[in-house]
């Protein structure tokens, strides 16, 4: 719901503006009988404030914070009509509840306004004139004076949303300026100090998952067998146990995964080269294979730099039933490319809501099951709606298991030589893990706790102890570009081995002692089994 602070600011603004503006016309004799347009204006002002409060409240409930930060702006404005339609499909119950309450309040306001109109019509004219002007002047003066306070001025709904949209457009403008800046600075690439230190042939596949929570994978101990294919490959994989995303939303997370930007310097993506640029400078042929529609913002700038691009999703973006398995031929073609050094980025739709659109019907394995997970959710007081979404989410995880495992097998079967495949998700997902909610979550650890796993030929033959040490290193993905550059064997002024999770020089202590943060607070790994929902409050 809307915060007390926001509610107080909106109430003050509405309390001073509405009576002041509407009261002018009540007090003036000419408007003794209120005209219809004045009623429309009065109701419009009231509706604007209440709709603004309702929208902010919904966004706070959905994202866990008010719609100021970059991640919410991207989620609101960086979308297309079909993705918007999918959002409504996924959240129609909550939206229906909010809409019903808003309609009820609106009807009550309309009735109250009519009652006030009849009451005013019966009051003596002189009473209106004498008592009206002074109070109206005070209210209007207070309303205007409040706008000298920048914080209060920005809470005016007539300004709040236009300002937010202008902020978003400015970010897009910065991205366009970045393209121009990069073009101008081509001659300055020597300052990057790029050096390739690897073998003659090297292939790195980077699979980027979407909205994937590791606590829903049997590979990480989940009570449902959602990842049987990855489970079978377990001995050949390095499965990192304590990795979190830097952000709970796609765009802001990817900005920090692909560039030197991190939680300390979030704007570094504006001025420093991304992974693809550094790889190409080192002589790599780059591929971008995606089941997400081409992006016209920052991510579009990155993907368009790839030497070869394949976007199989030509329809409704995240609202398209185009399954990630359809990316496999594109990956196999890239693996067969004769280039000696290849970086192949594969961007999945993963488990992004709407969950039941992420898998074919043959993977609807957990629909209506009555198992220990269902009992845990029920005991924790999760609604039947959330329990159903958890089943659909687990189906999506099961299909994601097939996709990722198949890509690992394809990479394993590729031409001999150095080869690695890293799978990491952009962010997690809350699906009844800690509360009765399904979707992105800024405040809950479930929005950040992601899987990360690696297959690499260079690690074969290492001891179980070495593997266990690696798997238990704490990490956050705003430093993931260092690990990618390590796999690529590319050194530069932007690479730090202390942030490369595979490096012998990796400094675990930094990540254990406050470097990792979620929602502005230090992240503390949970000491309870994180794949079980919390108990009911008071139980």
PLM features: what roles do these ranges have?
Residues 1-160:
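Transmembrane and membrane-interface helices of multi-pass
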Residues 207, 421-423:
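Residue-level marker for buried hydrophobic side chains located in beta-strands
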Residues 192-195, 436-443:
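Short, P/G- and charge-enriched loop/turn segments at secondary-structure junctions
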Residues 329-332, 370-421, 454, 479:
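A long, amphipathic alpha-helix that forms part
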Residues 7, 11, 30-33, 113-118, ...:
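Membrane-interface soluble catalytic domains
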Residues 138-206, 211-375, 449, 477, ...:
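Active-site-proximal alpha/beta segments of enzymes that process anionic O-linked groups
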